[in-house]
Each structure stands twice: as C-alpha cells, then as structure tokens.
Amino acid sequence: MKKLFFFTCLLAAVQYNSAQVTFTPQSAGTNYTDRGFVDMNGDGLDDILSVSNSNIQVLYQQQDGSFVESIVSTTFADISPSWSLAAADYDRNGQTDLLYGGGNGVTFMRANDDGTQYTEISGTEYVFSQRSNFVDINNDGHLDAYVCHDVEPSVFYINDGEGNLEYFQGGLGDYPSGGHYGSVWLDFDNDRDIDMFIAKCGGESERRDNEMHVNNGDGTFTESGASLNLEDDMQTWSSAWADYDNDGDLDGWVGASTFNSGFHRLMRNNGNGTFTDVINASGLTGFNVTSIENQTYDFDNHGNADIVSGGVILYGNGDLTFTISSTNIGNGGFGDINEDGFVDAISNGQLIINNTNNNNWLKINTIGVESNIDGIGARIEITTASGTQLREVRSGEGFRNMSTLNTHFGLGLDQEIESVTIYWPSGIIDVFDDLEINTTHSIVEGQSALNTGEFLTSDLSVFPVPALNNLTVSNIQDIEDPVYTVFDVSGRKVMQGRLLNNNIDVSQLTSGQYILRISGQKFRRNNVKATKFTKR
C-alpha cells in the first residue's frame, strides 16, 4: 500500500448561508473505471473506488486528509459493472461488498474480513442489468440485492442470513419486456417501511410507465403508480427523491433522458397518497438539459435539498422552487472525500472538490445491530431553529454509480441541533439531543437507550384481548397521524404501517404475546404509547 496526498485550492469562504459553492477538479488517482465514493472498511470515512474485471482499487481516506492505496487482484469477474455498481456490507463482516451489474448478468464481489481479498460470485442467469441496489427487501435484518432488468422482469437476491443470496425474478418490476432502468428505495408514505420507485424507459408507452411499488408491511408490494399519479410514460433513467419543501415527506424529481415523450417532472408529495407535478411553478421550465443521471444532496449546506441532473446543480430554495446554476460537476458518485462536511464528486477520473462556504453541517454514519449493519433503509430527521430536515440511507442512487452511505445535512448558519431522530428498519428509534455540529457522528442502533418498554402505558387500550383477526386501538386522539409498530417478545419488528380507522389486521401473526407501539409520524418522546397484547 502507498500513502497519497491530494491538494486543492480553496476559495475564500462566503459570509451568508445562501451562497452557491464552486468546485475544483483534480486527478482522482484511479487506475480503472471509477465507480464512486463509499466507506469500504467501516471507519466512517468515504473512500474512492475503482474497479476492473480483475482488480479492485480502493483509495482509503485517512483522518489527516491523505489516502492509502490498495489494489486487490481478484478472480476474473464474469460480469463487469458496465451498467451499474452498488456497495454494502451484506455479510456483516465489517468490510464492504460490491455488486457489478452488467449487460449479461450480475457478479457479487464478497470481501473477506480485512478487505484484502474478494470472492467472485456470478450467477448463470441472464440479466441485462440497469440500476442495482442493496436493500433489506424483507426486513429481516439482512441485506438483499435488487437489479433492474432492461428486457425482462427485474430480479432480486434474498439473503439467507449467512451471506448467501438466492436469485428470484418477478414480483418487483414485472413488465414482460422490461424497461426497468432506475430503481430507488424510499419511504414515500411515512409508514416506516421501504417502498420502491422505478424510472422507466422504452419504445412503447406502456413499457416506459413509471412505477411505485408500495410496501404492504407484510413482505409484499403493490404496484400503485397510477393511483399515486406517478405512472408517467416519459423517457427517464433515474429519479431523485428528497423533501424539497421541508414538509416532512419525500417529493420526486424525475429527470427526462430525452424530451421526445415529455419534459422533466417535479412530483410534490401531497401527503394523502397522491402526487402533483409542480414543474411549471418550480423555476425549472427553462432547464433543457437531459441526462440519465439524477441525484440529490445539499451541496452548499444551506439546509435545503438540491438536485444534480446531468451534472448541473439545481439549488433548492426549500419550497419546491429551484435556482439553475452554471456549475456542471459531471455524472458520477458523491460523498465527502476530504471530511470537511461538504459534498464532493468523482467523474471520469477526476475528483470534483467542493470549495465550501461558511455554512454548518452534520453527518451521520449509521451502524445497524438489529437492522442491517449499514443502516440502509433508516430515516434520519434533524431539527434546528430553521425547522426539520429528513434524509434516508440508500445504496444505489442515480443510474450507474455508487455514492456515500453516510447521511449529510446542511445547517446554514444554525449553531445548534435541537434533536436527531433515527428510525431504524427494525422499528427501533434513537433520539439524541444537542449533537455537536460540523462533525461526523457514528451512531450504533439502540445507542440512545430509547426502547419500546420505556413507553408501556396504561392509557392505550386495545380490544378484543386476545385478538384473532383484528385489533382495535383507542385513546390515541392526542397522537397526530399515528403509525403502529408490532414487536414480538424478542424485540423484533413484525408489523408496521399507518394506523387507519384505529384498526390493525393481525390475522397473519402467529399465536403469542406482542407489544404494540403507537407514535406520531414525527416522533416525540411525549407522543408515543405502547401496550402488550395477545394474539390467539
């Protein structure tokens, strides 16, 4: 291994929180196809990743700003990541594994316990890969994988808990001739389970109808694009989802790859199970760039989510309007490659270094215990004097590259954080007060010692007891927009969803004792109740 130092020229910092930022390009020092930024060794720092069929090059970021280079020769991969790459620690050994999505199939590169060797695992199935993701599809605490298929129904790989992945096709993106291009996993309906949007492309209109697969909370999904007003037959390869108006739910930017079938879409989440296209009021009707790459970060740390589409930054104003910048940072992966709290990029062998400003920031590195070790699927909300922001942990955004698994928040000129709330996929909720700003915090699931038993109350009523098929809940009129979570006696989450008409279908539960927790969509300690119940 060799130690490398990268230097860049910093511009003078600005004094106000709405300033756009500039960027300085420099060599990335990569030898192969650069595929993004991701923490490869579990130290919380983003590293530079470059791969070929027979080599994996990692430039490990150090605390002093230098990089230690490692090049590992691998068994020749049957499939190269010619279409996409995803990364995560799917076998929970502390080292990041890779998924190569190619034109003929899928290869997994499984890291050993110190990242010095990789085991090449390639299936025999034909997959014309597009976007790929690591995600816990069945929420059993183990990361699965998903790959969009261009010409057939999409495929996924279920983790058996020992790091072995079983291939499945169909059920999540089923159009017979495919057209599945850009998958992103998100919780759009605030019921605390993970849904999936697929940006689609194709010759005939039906093949390119965008899809939203809604998690039913029981391991199944229902494609609901039409009822949500998201089934659009524009040509698109990827989308970018964030809370662009800071109202507590995720909105969607669906970027057009060509204008032959329609313009860009900016879909406002109405909070009632529908979306409305607000592109005409967004300030983006003059944005005539088309691209296959769309992602979202807060590049200037002003506290609002921005969009990067085709390399052009669209600065968010926090109200679903945007300012088109003259900055183009290329299509690639994103992360903080010099630990200064500002988002950088990698594209075509160059690091695109953010020259920063005076705004403050916070980063969270999630470490799952009951949930998957990377915390993928977790939602993080922070509250400051300026309001509440939310982010989600995702593996595989945009179309082709891999970006950081750390969640990044710009704070503007706010000097304090009132609270940080992490909703883990397991159902565990961590709440922290007064975390230090301008710092990366590595948070272990359950670290805040906030658990379900703490909230057992005498004023939450359920009947009948024992319950057979349905459980009715009462005395929750003080909880706004209630969400229910059911845990078994070991503390494992077994059900979750929005509470509708004070009724929960428990027919699928096995007989035994359970804990029911009711909380508001915006979690507060004084806004949660829990009780035990019996299923017969």
Segments from the language model and where they lie:
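Short glycine/acidic-enriched loop and turn motifs that connect beta-strands
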Residues: 55, 105, 152, 202-205, ...
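An edge-strand/N-cap motif at the start of beta-rich repeat modules
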Residues: 18-50, 63-65, 94-96, 141-143
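Gly/Ser/Thr/Pro-enriched helix-cap/hinge segments flanking short amphipathic alpha-helices
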Residues: 23-27, 322-457
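Blade-edge motifs of beta-propeller repeat domains
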Residues: 19-33, 60-81, 109-127, 158-178, ...
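C-terminal outer-membrane/trafficking sorting elements
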Residues: 385-390, 415, 421-423, 454-536
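Beta-propeller blade termini
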Residues: 31-42, 83-92, 129-139, 180-190, ...
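Glycine-aliphatic tripeptides that mark coil-to-beta-strand junctions in extracellular
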Residues: 42-46, 94-98, 141-147, 192-198, ...
